[in-house]
Amino acid sequence: MFIHQADNWTNFVWDKDKISDKLMQVMQALGYMHGRLSMLGFEEQLKATAESITAEIVSTSQIEGITLKTNSVRSSVARRLGVPADGVAESISHDVEGIVTVELDATHNYSQPLTHERLFNWHNELFPIDRRKHYQIDIGQYRTHGMQVVSGNMGRERVHYQAPEAQRVPQEMEIFLNWYNDATIAASPLKAAIAHFWFVCIHPFDD
């Protein structure tokens, strides 16, 4: 049985004793970071923010097996944030521009409601129009077929996880978004962790 096949599967529970120390470390690190930033001038804060966003985009892309040119990402982020560029400007691909667009919207407009349409727009940005002919997937919409996490050679595959059936995805995402946008549930590292796990379990998009 996969998690989404259980009754009330989104009623997540966790062991507070096992995560309390980690959560405290995260909150202390956040406090330290905000304290350091507050000591910087406005321009230095922008530069620090640009470097942080650049590093996150590059490292997140590597997790997905995508290697981006750090200088190209930095140039795109700096231009969007109005940070003076150092050295020769890098040429910026559509791939980089799309990923930067998604990252900046997510990090700078985090107080805006997360909607189906916003997620569709993010998915569109990740697959530039000039390269879509290379992808045999649904883009800018929820997937219309099954999704599995599989390893192994062809004919000897091992299914590690099977996501909810495609016809369930819109309703599952509606439940998820209602929870995510609930103002009575305060933003926190724990909420972010639950949201990440929940979203991955649904796996609503092709990739």
Where are the regions a protein language model picked out?
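FIC/Doc superfamily catalytic core
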Residues: 1-207
